[in-house]
Design a protein with these regions (language model features):
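Walker A/P-loop
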Residues: 46-80
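Short loop/turn elements that form and flank the Walker-type P-loop nucleotide-binding site
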Residues: 45-47, 73, 88, 114-117, ...
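Canonical AAA+ ATPase core
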Residues: 65, 99-104, 125-136, 141-199, ...
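Hydrophobic positions in the central parallel beta-sheet of the AAA+
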Residues: 80, 121-122
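Conserved C-terminal "switch" segment of AAA+ ATPases
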Residues: 2-4, 18-22, 74-75, 170-238, ...
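The Walker A (P-loop) glycine that initiates the GxxxxGKT/S ATP-binding motif of P-loop NTPases
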Residues: 54, 124-125
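AAA+/P-loop NTPase substrate/partner-engagement loops
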Residues: 70-101
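Pre-Walker A (pre-P-loop) alpha-helix and adjacent loop at the N terminus of AAA/AAA+ ATPase modules
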Residues: 8-48, 252
């Protein structure tokens, strides 16, 4: 919300270049950010929240990483994995226990907020959290404040929170309350890329790796390296983009003789 128009244009350029595919989402995201900046300034929209659904490896986490990079963060991405918060007392671990109890010095959520230098939080595996943890975010998204167990308030007005989940559309409606669903600014399903899109991704990723290698390691690379890597990667074998990316990296390392 603090970016001027030129900085916002630069933000979107870096964001678009950092996130491959998902063109429809990118357009929706630009509209969301534009509206958010307006209504945040007049005090009507505290937090921009995205709830991204889909199988593992389809690019949900990459959205948060792309935002993180585009904002120019100098710290690591602030991430809380809700897979660790499924027990009945999980909320205490997240926001700290009351005074006198173990963990009363704080909680992971507050620690991650304090670590972030760009106002961005990734909440991973949202569907695995205990109901008390899920319900806690009703107030966070509504009021733009994180409150610990000792009633200390932390202002997160202007933050972006990206929630990711492997949940299906059907289970989303049955497992997430209408009250919480209505508080998410964007709710979307990320699908697996087609083989055609995956081939385009391989070209994109290999060019990206070669560019970085030349910048940070050496200008000296084998002739025809790009095409050789592309030829060795059979995209039909990989549904998960994470596995496809690993194959690209392994092939690159093999062909440069590292």
């Amino acid at each position: 919300v603090d970016l001027n128009d030129k900085e916002l244009d630069d933000f979107f350029k870096v964001f678009d270049a950092s996130l491959y595919g998902h063109e429809r989402f990118k357009e929706e995201f630009k509209k969301l950010v534009t509206a958010y900046r307006v209504f945040n300034k007049i005090g009507e929209h505290k937090i921009l929240s995205l709830f991204l659904m889909g199988d593992s490896g389809v690019g949900k986490t990459e959205v948060a990483r792309a935002i993180h990079k585009a904002l120019g963060s100098r710290t690591k991405l602030a991430k809380v994995n809700f897979g660790n918060y499924s027990s009945h007392d999980a909320l205490n671990s997240l926001i700290g226990s009351p005074l006198g109890y173990i963990g009363s010095d704080g909680g992971e959520l507050l620690k991650r907020i304090q670590e972030s230098d760009v106002g961005l939080i990734l909440i991973d595996e949202f569907e695995k959290a205990d109901s008390a943890v899920v319900n806690y975010f009703l107030d966070v998204l509504e009021n733009g404040k994180v409150v610990n167990s000792q009633a200390d308030e932390y202002d997160v007005n202007g933050y972006i929170i990206v929630f990711t989940s492997n949940i299906t559309k059907e289970n989303f409606r049955s497992k997430v309350s209408p009250e919480l669903r209505s508080r998410f600014d964007y709710k979307g399903m990320f699908n697996l890329l087609t083989d055609t899109d995956k081939k385009k991704y391989v070209h994109f990723r290999v060019n990206q790796i070669i560019s970085k290698y030349k910048e940070f390691v050496s200008e000296d690379i084998p002739d025809g390296l790009h095409d050789r890597v592309v030829c060795e990667v059979d995209v039909s074998k990989y549904k998960n983009m994470r596995d496809l990316n690993k194959k690209i990296k392994d092939t690159f390392v093999k062909l440069i003789g590292a």
